[in-house]
Amino acid sequence: MVDGDAEEVARSAEESTEPVKIVQRLGHRGLTIATAESLTAGALAARIADVPGASIALLGGVVAYSNGVKENVLGVDAELLETHGAVDGGVAAQMAQGAALVCRAGLGVSTTGVAGPEPHQGKSVGTVYLGFYVAAGVVQRLGIRMPENCSQDETASVEGALAGYRLLDLDGDREAIRWASVEAALQLVSDVLHTEPTGLPHA
């Protein structure tokens, strides 16, 4: 879990992870990425798309604010949504998987959480789950493993794929929580890529 002041979390992630570096690293490995966003409502995809030439890696994204879109577009399990609500690690992982499958990308990353100002479905303001999914072929080709400070999700329906999530517990206002969620999601993508056994060049 990553916890603390939302603005501090955002700045720390922003300083250590530049979107241009992520796009370059994805491109150098022939990898593509797709996003699924709830509380960030497209801001994560926009952050990646700000990089000139981002189309080499970014295939698309889904803004899944409602449970209906999570279920019907991204394929999130209806029973999971009913039992645990939208703000859940398993939901985040399935959202990431759904984005990757819908967009036919090698990697998927997602955001779901409570930006405020009020709690939601029993989850406190600042509770955020970031999900990720790595296709089986990418796992096999690059040896991608579970990054630190993440939990594996066993509901990935594709054999050999890797799916998981990272929990954030943030203090701050709505804007700061959404900002931190975007930057922390980029950090998560970087962390996933850095599990490649040979490491990544600083390109």
Which stretches of residues belong to each language-model region?
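Short alpha-helical segments enriched in small residues
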Residues: 1-203
